[in-house]
Amino acid sequence: MQILLANPRGFCAGVDRAISIVERALELYGAPIYVRHEVVHNRYVVDNLRKRGAIFIEEISEVPDDAILIFSAHGVSQAIRAEARSRNLTMLFDATCPLVTKVHMEVARASRKGKEAILIGHAGHPEVEGTMGQYNNAEGGMYLVESPADVWNLKVKDEDNLCFMTQTTLSVDDTSEVIDALNARFPNIVGPRKDDICYATTNRQEAVRDLASDADVVLVVGSKNSSNSNRLAELAQRVGKPAYLIDSAEDIKEEWITGISLVGVTAGASAPDILVQQVIERLKSLGADSVQELHGREENIVFEVPKELRVEVKEIS
């Protein structure tokens, strides 16, 4: 049995930055550090940060005075940001992915201009809640759609004053169908100058499509609440291959790979490489005898942490 590794896979620049912000805050200021929502959607990452002194909360009211607070990579609404700033906090750091912030700016711009805005995204996802929360113009409107059917059922105030944007971690194929419906339903709608679906989401979906075309079964390392990881498993299934979303090597069931020649392995943008390595070791214990990494797009994007966290511990001692 051979293991095929998708390329690229695992951490993206936004996730790497968000985790680094929490780690640096813990190193520089010590525990506890409060984080609104899981900093990224990965159980292994969150559990490790929790052990080091990060406290994950959902409500700003849970944060005591004089504490240090970090917003997660998914972003927050203007209301949450204002609430945090009104508190007597020692420091406030924003780990929102810069590519999510780009979408926030698009929504805020639409709100200022009085344009109605339509967001393509999954209801209940924290990124969607934060993005929707950038709009505050009562004379306009902010709407959420998930499917072409939602588009055809949508009622807006002015069909000639519309724009749209998307969640950054969606299925490229599904989103294309929704955009086609938007353009058909609202011919004058304006989209973003550049795709809102981020480079990492697009690259990993392209890579898993290539992987699934060769593999007999695909294992996607990622947590159940990770949007981009779920999309990878769904895409592999659409190619016609069995695909399983796993948090760790322990989740692998032997019957998944019984009689299989090629096992494909990839990881969502919030899954660390150590989990992939553990999956490889588990597969080797079940009979895998070689590992091959596929060719893919090279990624060299880096997002800096806030300047306050780019200092040595001794500088603030």
UniProtKB/Swiss-Prot annotation:
Dimethylallyl diphosphate binds at residues 41, 74, 125, 226-228, 270. CDD domains: lytB_ispH (cd13944). GO terms for molecular function: 4 iron, 4 sulfur cluster binding; 4-hydroxy-3-methylbut-2-enyl diphosphate reductase activity; metal ion binding. InterPro entries: LytB/IspH. Isopentenyl diphosphate binds at residues 41, 74, 125, 226-228, 270. [4Fe-4S] cluster binds at residues 12, 97, 198. It catalyses: isopentenyl diphosphate + 2 oxidized [2Fe-2S]-[ferredoxin] + H2O = (2E)-4-hydroxy-3-methylbut-2-enyl diphosphate + 2 reduced [2Fe-2S]-[ferredoxin] + 2 H(+); dimethylallyl diphosphate + 2 oxidized [2Fe-2S]-[ferredoxin] + H2O = (2E)-4-hydroxy-3-methylbut-2-enyl diphosphate + 2 reduced [2Fe-2S]-[ferredoxin] + 2 H(+). Its cofactor is [4Fe-4S] cluster. Belongs to the IspH family. This is 4-hydroxy-3-methylbut-2-enyl diphosphate reductase. It comes from Photorhabdus laumondii subsp. laumondii (strain DSM 15139 / CIP 105565 / TT01) (Photorhabdus luminescens subsp. laumondii). The lineage of its organism: Bacteria, Pseudomonadati, Pseudomonadota, Gammaproteobacteria, Enterobacterales.
